[in-house]
A protein has these predicted regions:
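Short, surface-exposed connector motifs at secondary-structure boundaries
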Residues: 1, 19-26
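Glycine-rich NAD(P)-binding loop of Rossmann-like domains
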Residues: 16, 22, 126-128
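ALDH superfamily catalytic-core signature
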Residues: 26, 32-154
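PLP-dependent aminotransferase-like
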Residues: 1-15
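Surface-exposed charged/polar residues within alpha-helices that form helix-capping/stabilizing sites
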Residues: 16-17, 140
Length: 154
């Protein structure tokens, strides 16, 4: 069984071709629910096999028996790998109440220690967001969370 990963600037044209071409027997997408709906609809004419991994709703859970330092290290990777622009990044954290203060303090310290910049520069630990749209999406998520009672740790 083979796998092909296609990249290009006209994703709509690529998607339409893959979904309508008889040579392609199955489509797999890891991506947004919006794009998943489009591809599923386009594949339905041929009753093409489709598997979809959608939404990126990955919680990071810390129980009270966890090694806090290891949990913080894991949270940093899970939240900030590739500037938090992958489908496997955690989008929320659940921490048991009796360890919340210690965990959140250490997580805030680790986050403050990050250096954002060009990945080729010394000391840089994470790159910038990919574009203005990505920045605006992050800002919207922050505003939404705060409006629902979340606190920003600094």
């Amino acid at each position: 069984m083979g796998c092909n990963i296609l990249m290009g600037t006209d994703s709509s044209a690529i998607g339409k071709e893959l979904c309508s071409n008889d040579v392609v027997r199955k489509i797999h997408l890891t991506g947004s629910t919006e794009v998943g709906r489009i591809l599923m609809r386009q594949c339905s004419d041929q009753i093409k096999k489709v598997s979809l991994e959608l939404g990126g709703n990955a919680p990071f859970i810390v129980f009270d028996d966890a090694d806090i330092d290891e949990a913080v290290a894991g949270a940093m990777i899970s939240n900030y790998i590739n500037a938090d622009q992958t489908c496997v990044c955690a989008n929320r954290m659940y921490v048991q109440e009796n360890i919340y203060e210690e965990f959140s303090k250490k997580l805030a310290e680790a986050t403050r220690a990050m250096k954002v910049g060009n990945g080729f520069d010394d000391g840089v630990t994470t790159g910038p967001l990919i574009d203005q749209q990505a920045l605006e999406k992050v800002e919207e998520h922050i505003e939404d969370a705060v409006s629902k009672g979340a606190s920003i740790l600094s």
